[in-house]
């Protein structure tokens, strides 16, 4: 055994630096052998790190924990925590405490020759109990036994990827050690953590679970309430949600209470302890408003309530605001959905990924993880539906399980009265006088419907106190920021996030409500109504409106001239040309059902031009900032009554990297009016004017080119429009007897928002 360990150490130290590979024992993939193999491997990695002139102290401390070198680990953790303990951010102050707690407990157990659990209790009381509420609320999140499942899954994935390998990179080694350490820490804490956290909570807070809040119609809402013990009356912060995860929701309510608010979680009817049918969206506004009234009448309430949440829980504050409850004084939402606008469809084109969601949220009192995360089932559904060419309405028949909620949604393809009833509509926005803060991201599901809500609010109420924070975030980061327990998320889908964009939006939440409910200072980041990070420039900018993000529009025409780079691309030019460009798409073709889509990253070496045309500009003479919403004018003839199209914008850097800017897609018949379908006349020259609802902000490099991909939506993950003019959900490949033929005319252009 010692000889094997020595050989590993020798191979590590003697290996050429350029190789940067660390040998791993074959037993590392054997779960039963891990307690014996991993400490030995960790010591080898420590030797590797010590040969480095600047070892990463966080990685080193984890390796020391796995190796059983607890005193060394505490020394490393002490160096990590020394500059953090007096930081103004409680998130920073709480960093690495779980590892300190684990190492101290192990040392105490060894020195006193007692069981770990007893040492853990003693160390918890010594380390966690003295913390202030804000820091402890974050620290205990990292001690929960509920984290074990996620840690175990991460380790299982690591081990699966190691099969057949005899050496791995330093990064892979550190990840393996970190994930193994994480699992062992949570295994050791076990159920004792829950007992200790409950004791600590009872000392700091009054927690009421499964509170039945009576509604005027005889129904009830299930609520969780957490309030500080030493404060008789406080403003309340309400999150009204369909996502009933007891652990996560208690953390949110505790976090609010730690910031001197009453934290209230309200669940939609039928969830948790309440009775009734679970119906997403349709009744949430009225119920949330009544819950606001109920909270205001409680003896611990000072009568002022704020609402917050993200995604679905970002929709509910808007739904409540539609009802104008008197006690609702402020809202903050992240990547909020707007039913009928961005879910279950965007641009009136339905997304398949929404299909499993009703099963996830409505089939039990909590959440149906087993069904929702059955990725093989949903991938097969997409594949089989697309390959079959059957109508979109047949998704539930192909899946084999009725999905009445999804069926009801897709039966409303226009933004009609069904959707209007759920959130403010047109002039109803004019009556929303409370302050609003929205947070959003540029990428994937990051925008939510934030731009829609903002645009409508300021259109109908120009003096609205409505702020937006937006940066290089996806759906989750748009709600929380880049903060994670050990620091910040560094990348998003291949793109390295600017340092300036690394912010904790949850901290902003409490500063926002301090400002709007307690008369505190406005958060510094809200220097103007629109607050946006310019990617690539590493700077935040501020503007009074969306339009003011740009100083001019740069017009680029879709030219029939070849660009010469890449080979099959057309020119994105600054002058109109007379020539037209044909595009033919066989909507019945299914040989691409198993095709791997190229590109897709925020920063990538490829892009997807399937069923479309690529347009490329000349290199930019100098660095150029593009910030705001892009728009376009398309002139064309088509041989069908309708089609779904997409425009995707990219920066192509001199190094050959594609950077996402912004996409736009829509059903042609709804571009003019989301609420009313306007079909094309086949063969007649038509024109469309559109504006994106997704913001972009990027500093493009000198020498970069602009790339626009104009394509037809035809893929396994979205509804397919076959162009007959009848209801799209009833169309099939039998309606695609002839390919879609479009002629794009030279008068077509894109207006891109430039700031000089």
Language-model segments: residues:
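Accessory cap/linker subdomain of secreted extracellular hydrolases
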Residues: 132-185, 196-199, 322-324, 330-430
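N-terminal cap/lid segment of alpha/beta-hydrolase-fold proteins
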Residues: 191-232, 620-622
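Cap/lid segment of the alpha/beta-hydrolase catalytic domain
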Residues: 227-296, 481-493, 609, 641, ...
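A catalytic-pocket lid/entrance helix-loop region that shapes and gates access to the active site
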Residues: 308, 315-380, 442, 461-510
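C-terminal, loop-rich substrate-recognition/catalytic regions characterized by aromatic stacking residues
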Residues: 390, 483-756
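Short beta-strand/loop motif that positions the catalytic acidic residue
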Residues: 432, 438-440
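Active-site-adjacent alpha-helix of alpha/beta-hydrolase-fold enzymes
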Residues: 448-467
